[in-house]
Swiss-Prot record:
CDD domains: PRTases_typeI. GO terms for molecular function: magnesium ion binding; orotate phosphoribosyltransferase activity. Homodimer. Belongs to the purine/pyrimidine phosphoribosyltransferase family. PyrE subfamily. The keyword Glycosyltransferase applies. Its EC number is 2.4.2.10. 5-phospho-alpha-D-ribose 1-diphosphate binds at residues 26, 72-73, 99-100, 103, 105, 124-132. Catalyzes the transfer of a ribosyl phosphate group from 5-phosphoribose 1-diphosphate to orotate, leading to the formation of orotidine monophosphate (OMP). It is an enzyme of class 2 (transferase). It comes from Aliivibrio fischeri (strain MJ11) (Vibrio fischeri). This is Orotate phosphoribosyltransferase. Pathway: Pyrimidine metabolism; UMP biosynthesis via de novo pathway; UMP from orotate: step 1/2. It comes from the Bacteria. Orotate binds at F34, F35, T128, R156.
Amino acid sequence: MKAYQREFIEFALEKEVLKFGEFTLKSGRKSPYFFNAGLFNTGRDLARLGRFYAAALADSGIEYDVLFGPAYKGIPIATTTAVALADHHDTDKPYCFNRKEAKDHGEGGNLVGSALEGRIMLVDDVITAGTAIRESMEIIQANGADLAGVLVAIDRQEKGKGELSAIQEVERDFNCSIISIVSLTDLISFLEEKGDNAEQLEAVKAYRAEFGI
């Protein structure tokens, strides 16, 4: 686990974005942890969040031309990632996001920001069922662009309806790389390093044993 990944987990815990306990997911599964990126909700939080996304992007080595943030949660993520890339990595990338409903006045259309062309890096908070990615792919393909990769905050590394995770299904269906700032494996490593809550650690490990990929 790299330093920025450890710092990200600490940041998420500090802001109560990452919580341990017992949570019922949309899938009906009982999870020992929950991640709610919507709680990164101040200017300072957003600035820090962008730096972690930018660090993961720089670390990945994936070539891309435009950052795309799907509405709604992806919009501030794309914006803050673009700012962090410019400020901390000397990388000035255009960014774009979509409207849920197309405008019929002014500039019109359903895209805001840069043109959606070339190789697209999609940024979002998490991938659960992959539905948002599939909707975004329709927009990307309609503009004649290609999906270079997807960057999310956390990869839960758990099975979907079949044996693959939602992330693995998206990788298979769209032939792209999906990267995350941290994964369930990193989370377990972090808990092992801390060593101050054996109960949390065992609950997360048991969850991985049952639902992990």
